[in-house]
Every structure is written in C-alpha cells, then in structure tokens.
Amino acid sequence: MSQPVSHKVDGLTRFRVDFAYDGTDYTGWAKQPGLKTVQGDLLAAMTTIFGPTENDFGMRIAGRTDAGVHAANQVAHVDLSAAQLKRLGRNPNVVARLNHMMSESIRIHEFKPAAPGFDARFSAIYRRYRYQISDNFAQKDPQQMRYVLNLTYALDPVAMNEAAQLLLGLNDFASFCKTRAGATTIRDLKRIKVRRNAQNI
C-alpha cells in the first residue's frame, strides 16, 4: 500500500475499501451485539491490525445489506490516525492481512487512500441490485442454492418485465422494508429489467 497522500478528515487519513461478500451466514452488514455480521468481522480484523477504535474507524458504507444478502462490488471508507497507520510497520499489505484474518466469505479487493471529498455513502451515484429466480425446480443447481430463489411453478418474465416498469421513477417503497427512524423510503428507480437467460430469470 502506498503512503497516504490525499484526503484528510479531522487530521485522519481516509481510505477507500472495495470488497465483496457472501452474506448467507451473516445477519446483515451492520454490527449487532452477539450476532455475526459483515461489519463486525471487518472491524475485528481491522482492530487486530490498527489497534482499538472508539468510533469503528469512522466506517461508512455505500449501502447496507440485510441478512443473507450478498455484495459483489461493495465500497466503504475508514478514517485512520497516524498512530494507527504506524502499526503497519514493515508489512503495509493491508489487503492480504485482512483477507488472511477473515472468513473466505469476505474478500477485500482494494484498500487505498481515498480521493479528496470521497464519502462511501454520499459519493455513490447509483446502486445496482440483481435478483436471480429459477422456475425450473427439477433442474436446480445445488451450487447456486445460496444465490438463486428456486420456485416450483412457471413464471412469465415478459409479463413480469411489463409490470416492473410501473415501479420506475420516484416512489415511496415503505411497504418493501422495515421502518427506521430518520431514514427515507423514497427512491428514484432509474432502470429495471426482467429477462430469462440460459438458466434463470
């Protein structure tokens, strides 16, 4: 990892973390007492490398995920002090060290100094989600069980795609999620497409 030369926040150096995870065995992203979460595992590994933190290293993520949800291209940022960075010593390869400490369900791809003004949550221009459904129950692939919803009845992707277009634009999606104090349920859905490929919808 190169020496940090960019974004400073309150005297701390901000880093961008790019990573992916299989959320099957986790109760979501956000750390929760007594529960296995993605953030909890990442914080534990970072604490081993950088030492104790009172504010979770200022960690913020582009978008939280719920229990069992996966992320292919997740982004977070953390803020580290000079003292914490000094603990890297002669082995500054943070990516390799974090991956060595964590379950293979979480893989860090990059850990690098953030660009000036970068904020993992507010710098995100959009977020993309993919849902996979199989209506060919007899041919379901056991290797894909964690990533595909398997149904026992046939679906009509053409009709589904037509209906899905009604969700486009600025709408209140409160009925799709749990209510959180201070959180908005209004989202601007830019694009949605339902199609059948070789195996799934």
Which residues does each PLM region occupy?
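Structured-RNA-binding interfaces characteristic of tRNA pseudouridine synthases
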Residues: S2-I201
